[in-house]
Design a protein with these regions (language model features):
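A compositional/structural signature marking long, glycine- and acidic/polar-rich segments
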Residues: 269-298
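Extracellular glycan-targeting catalytic surfaces
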Residues: 1-255, 261-269, 291-297
């Protein structure tokens, strides 16, 4: 499978901008969609990039490199202190929780507390707020981060379309913070030494639910030219984070039912936006991961 080695190449190519601009100019429905996207994104871009970035669920203070789980639940985080904040894994394999997922506007910036998360208990009268261990919060952490990454993806697209720097600044801040946080964090370790160790992902409890990848891949591709200039010293870190993610998705999972198909989409997406194998010392670039999906078995 041959791909263009230039960016953009994931959702569009070098001709896509002109075609999209023409569509927006000529079709009222396209103009309406585009304006609504701008309005939604401006709510955050106009606050400055740090507002949205600071709501990411990260180990802002401890910079934990190790996440420990017990079966299908989070247990604790620790390990050596990374040189930058690291990304939190979600609280449990199941979505079920008594607690209400807060809106982004209700989150405090740079929140990391040894007591866990401060959430409203939706099962009690008046929905009182409580400090709760992350293990009881289902997929709230992942849901928050995926929403933020989705906004950043939209900002990257808007920068590509308009050239407005506020969109690039927002997208780059979120992307850089989160991907650096993945790069410096390891795959979670199951203290029960059970089957869950073969399923767990970098952001979720199952490698088939690494939803963050769905936002990060197009974000990176739309923002590539900006990152290549503004974050040139971080490009190897971004590639390393993507490759760590893909490698873990290859290593984990189950050999039956539909897991292989669900894993393949993430691996293929990452392969499509990496550079050629020759660009990396380990020779694991776009061709390597695409070949793994098309011609090899994990």
């Amino acid at each position: 499978m041959k791909l263009s080695r230039g960016h953009h190449r994931y959702l569009t190519d070098s001709n896509g901008k002109v075609e999209t601009q023409k569509l927006i100019k000529e079709e009222p429905w396209a103009q309406e969609v585009f304006e609504k996207l701008k309005q939604r994104t401006d709510r955050y871009a106009d606050r400055g990039p740090e507002w949205l970035t600071s709501r990411l669920q990260m180990y802002w203070k401890t910079h934990a490199t190790e996440v420990y789980i017990k079966g299908e639940y989070y247990d604790h985080a620790g390990g050596e202190k990374a040189p930058a904040p690291t990304a939190m894994n979600t609280g449990a394999r199941s979505h079920a929780t008594n607690y209400v997922r807060p809106k982004l506007e209700d989150l405090k910036p740079y929140q990391e507390d040894a007591r866990g998360m401060y959430l409203a208990n939706g099962t009690l009268e008046g929905s009182p707020y409580e400090w709760v261990n992350s293990r009881t919060t289902g997929n709230i952490i992942q849901s928050i981060n995926v929403e933020i990454l989705g906004i950043a993806r939209d900002a990257a697209f808007l920068w590509w379309m308009t050239g407005e720097k506020k969109y690039a600044d927002l997208a780059a801040s979120v992307f850089d913070t989160y991907m650096t946080g993945i790069y410096y964090r390891n795959v979670p370790k199951d203290l029960n030494h059970g089957h869950q160790q073969t399923l767990v992902g970098m952001s979720s409890f199952e490698v088939i639910h690494e939803d963050a990848v769905n936002a990060l891949v197009p974000l990176y591709d739309f923002l590539y030219d900006y990152l290549k200039t503004d974050k040139a010293d971080k490009m190897d870190i971004y590639a390393g984070a993507f490759k760590k993610w893909a490698d873990n998705i290859i290593d984990n999972g189950v050999p039956h039912n539909n897991w292989n198909l669900m894993q393949a989409r993430y691996i293929m997406s990452i392969g499509m936006i990496l550079e050629s194998d020759a660009s990396y010392p380990d020779k694991k670039g776009g061709e390597y991961y695409i070949d793994y999906v098309l011609n090899r078995s994990s």
